[in-house]
Amino acid sequence: QAIGQFCAEHDIQAVVVSGDLTQRARLREFYACKQFLDSLNLPYLVVPGNHDIPLYALWRRVFTPFYGYQLFFGSLERDLETEDFYILGVNSIRRRYHTKGHISLEQIERIDQKLQAAPSNKYKILLAHQPFYIPAHQYGQKDCPMLAKIALQRWSQNGLNAILHGHLHQSAVDDLNQVYDLKVKQPILAVQAGTAISHRLHAGRPNSFNTIHLDGQVKHYYFDTVLQCFR
């Protein structure tokens, strides 16, 4: 309800969810997520997270890992264009890895071509689950896709402005142009999402989400348990 209220009170162009739509990839969890997103009455884009494929049901993990996700959300990689934003979804989940992210050369090329064809006046965003950079002191550093820097070197040349990701369940922002010394004019923000609505919180952090504006400003919103709203 608090997120629905926030969306109703603000000028939101789209909602994006960077994976972990479910806890254990159960059909009822996917259904609940779809019902919630539809209730916002806004365009939305999602990508799968490592929690969105079966963990213990090995037969399903091997042969139909994305069945539940695709049943409710369709293609694993979709795009969304709004008045000011051009958002590309990329699937970084592989059945052979538990938490580690992966992107292929084919995915790098596809995103690169999409960026080249994107309207020059729109803010260009990539949506993935695993981060493309994790500071050395943070848990999960090994989960970055192996080809992350190679991908960024390509995409940065064609106007990428930001990567939105989840996985670490903690809000943060980094500039990948500085981190990887990409030598492009624009900042390339890595915007890390916290846990939006799950009751399973990490390290006592409150539920949270981010907003990103056309000028690149990122704001973090945290749930106030007293006022029962995000602020």
Name what the model sees in each region.
Residues 14-20, 44-50, 91, 125-128, ...:
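Active-site neighborhood of phospho(di)ester-bond hydrolases with catalytic His/Asp-centered motifs
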Residues 1-32, 38:
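N-terminal active-site segment of His-dependent metallophosphoesterases
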Residues 120-137:
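Short acidic, glycine-rich surface-loop motifs adjacent to enzyme active sites
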Residues 31-110, 118, 154-156, 187, ...:
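Extended active-site neighborhood of metal-dependent phosphoesterases/phosphodiesterases
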Residues 140-215:
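Conserved beta-sheet core of the metallophosphoesterase superfamily
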Residues 23-28, 50-58, 95-98, 131-135, ...:
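Active-site environment of divalent metal-dependent phosphoester hydrolases
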Residues 213-231:
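A short C-terminal boundary segment appended to hydrolase-like catalytic domains
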Residues 20-21, 93-105, 133-142:
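Surface-exposed cleft-lining segments at the edges of enzyme active sites
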